[in-house]
Amino acid sequence: MARDAQKSPSFQQQRVIIPNKHGNKLVGILHESGTQEIVILCHGLRANKENFIMTNLAAVLENAGISSFRFDFTGNGESEGSFEFGSYWREAEDIRAVAQHFQETNRTVIAIVGHSKGANAALLYASKYHDIKTIVNLSGSPDLRIGLEYRFGKDFMERLRKEGFIELKAESAGPYTCFSTLNLLLFAFAEMS
């Protein structure tokens, strides 16, 4: 449905704030084409709505005459709350808040496009809620355990049992982030249940 450059409407970008179910404000940018249909764009780990992937996707959709909304998950970018590693279910609920906001304003969310961690959150959303038929997975992980081995090493479970915690060097969360047995297991396996 690409439109000719001559017929293409001028798009408006508008900052929109949407509360999630925990009362945190999710901040996003609406790329308005004037159509009822809209696509939700979800960023990856250590990124935000201003990431070049999100802005490029919004530009491509604009050129096709499709409205989109790119936003910061809780604890990322301008959105309220604290950053948490492995918070896929919380981010799926952020997507829910965004989807409901647009559905309540008589918009039709035609797709969710997620990159990396955002793709995993979008897939979890789709597994729980069945209201959006198109989910686009851009580099989401097919097996979250692979990510654990990559970040913590192949012996992470043995070290976790022995020491009770694992340290991860993470620039976005300070010099070191510690994971206890409980929060690492919740991260690793809650998504799979």
Where are these regions (language model features)?
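Short beta-strand element of the alpha/beta-hydrolase
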Residues: 36-44
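Catalytic nucleophile-loop/oxyanion-hole region of alpha/beta-hydrolase
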Residues: 49, 76-107
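The serine-hydrolase catalytic nucleophile loop
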Residues: 46-58, 73
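Alpha/beta-hydrolase fold nucleophile elbow
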Residues: 105-116
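Conserved alpha/beta-hydrolase
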Residues: 58-80
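The alpha/beta-hydrolase serine catalytic core
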Residues: 120, 125, 129-193
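N-terminal cap/lid segment of alpha/beta-hydrolase-fold proteins
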Residues: 2-34
